[in-house]
């Protein structure tokens, strides 16, 4: 049961402040904003709004170009830095994404969203030590947030630090006991540790929480193949 926590988190953090639209409506909106931006070339707001729509259409290069325009005039614009880094990630230009996240942290130290994104990006780049250091920093600075523990747990699990990962998933659950994803990650970790009985108990808990058994079928199979 594979999950892409990097993409899921980044998509969740994007606030476009627009209603759900069809692709045609989005393209029409972009055309309108492009004309307005041509008429008001100094308007940062118009360029950021257009770039946000470009991201929704997965037009990474167009979005990046708009953020470049903003950052040429305002090098420390937090929105442009964060979402240009996101666009760079989608374009697989990881070093450039990393540089933008790091610059943003210089200007907004300890920013939660940026720490999460940078920790996960480093893990994606196989910079495991740096990823774990950032995850530790994330937990130390945001120990009230369940996602901080879940991010660190994911990094620990990938490195085979299963007992630490299990502890962190339990911490995440203690801070947000309605998030079924955290329970599922915990189950996967228990299976990795060959603690099948405990994994089955957690699966039973998930079904009681309303998760359809069909969605958990693969995990049940893994427990039974012990």
Q: Where do the protein language model's features map onto the residues?
A:
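Terminal, low-structured helical/coil segments at or just beyond the last alpha-helical repeat
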Residues: 24-28, 188, 192-226
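N-terminal leader/linker segments that initiate helical-solenoid repeat arrays
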Residues: 17-61, 65
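Register position in tetratricopeptide repeats
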Residues: 56, 90-91, 124-125, 158-159, ...
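Structural marker of alpha-solenoid helical repeat scaffolds
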Residues: 39, 73-74, 107-108, 141, ...
């Amino acid at each position: 049961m594979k999950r892409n926590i990097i993409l899921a988190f980044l998509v969740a953090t994007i606030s476009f402040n627009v209603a759900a639209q069809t692709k045609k409506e989005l393209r029409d909106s972009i055309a309108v904003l492009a004309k307005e931006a041509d008429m008001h070339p100094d308007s940062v707001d118009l360029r950021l709004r257009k770039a946000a729509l470009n991201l929704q259409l997965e037009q990474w290069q167009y979005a990046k170009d708009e953020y470049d325009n903003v950052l040429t005039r305002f090098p420390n614009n937090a929105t442009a830095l964060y979402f240009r880094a996101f666009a760079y990630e989608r374009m697989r230009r990881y070093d450039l994404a990393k540089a933008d996240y790091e610059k943003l942290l210089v200007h907004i130290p300890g920013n939660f969203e940026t720490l999460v994104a940078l920790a996960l990006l480093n893990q994606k780049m196989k910079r495991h030590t740096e990823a774990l250091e950032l995850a530790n920093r994330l937990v130390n600075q945001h120990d009230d947030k369940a996602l901080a523990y879940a991010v660190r747990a994911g990094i620990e699990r990938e490195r085979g630090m299963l007992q630490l990962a299990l502890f962190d998933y339990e911490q995440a659950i203690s801070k947000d006991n309605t998030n079924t994803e955290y329970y599922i990650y915990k189950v996967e970790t228990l299976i990795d540790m060959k603690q099948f009985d405990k994994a089955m108990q957690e699966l039973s808990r998930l079904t009681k929480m309303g998760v359809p058994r069909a969605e958990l079928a693969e995990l049940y199979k893994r427990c039974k193949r012990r």
